[in-house]
């Protein structure tokens, strides 16, 4: 399997502060091998799986595993904690404005050979996020102790194309990555 970029091309693009999506792919017709790989990877901290399903029964086109986020944004009240490879920074701000800006700035050109979800921000918004939009009483006890919002930026994705029986190994190198 060959990677899609030479070392010189990579260095040149990175020096220009460009996001890069490095990948390699191969045909993999035995799905049980893919399932075994996924079971292994899902044991990793901060990993996730997206399984596309149609009409609740039929397996959809893609199975996506994401792992090794280089940044995680946690929102609690008006404090955003940014965890970049274990170094945490806190920012006091209006979370929804910050998140909208974050999403707008996440603009990565995906190579044509890859599925469109080959680079992503992923996360969740809890029910309590409504309190950032509307003034409603907060009488609930926070017994779960989870962030109101969590967004992560996975460096690695493994995507299996169920139609083409092809697996993609993807490494996202973001412009702010030190190499």
Question: What is the role of each PLM region?
Answer:
Residues 1-179:
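Signature of the chorismate-utilizing enzyme
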């Amino acid at each position: 399997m060959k990677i899609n970029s030479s070392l010189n091309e990579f260095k040149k693009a990175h020096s220009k502060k460009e996001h890069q999506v490095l990948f390699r792919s191969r045909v993999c017709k035995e799905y049980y091998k893919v399932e075994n790989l996924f079971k292994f990877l899902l044991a990793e901290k901060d990993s996730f799986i997206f399984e596309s399903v149609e009409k609740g029964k039929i397996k959809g086109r893609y199975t996506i595993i994401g792992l090794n986020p280089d940044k995680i944004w946690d929102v609690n009240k008006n404090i955003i904690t940014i965890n970049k490879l274990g170094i945490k920074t806190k920012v006091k701000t209006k979370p929804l404005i910050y998140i909208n800006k974050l999403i707008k700035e996440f603009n990565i050109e995906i190579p044509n050979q890859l599925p469109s979800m080959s680079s992503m921000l992923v996360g969740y918004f809890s029910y309590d996020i409504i309190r950032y939009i509307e003034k409603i009483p907060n009488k609930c006890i926070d017994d779960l102790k989870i962030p109101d919002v969590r967004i992560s930026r996975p460096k690695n994705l493994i995507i299996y194309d169920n139609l083409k029986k092809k697996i993609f190994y993807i490494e996202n190198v973001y412009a702010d990555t030190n190499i």
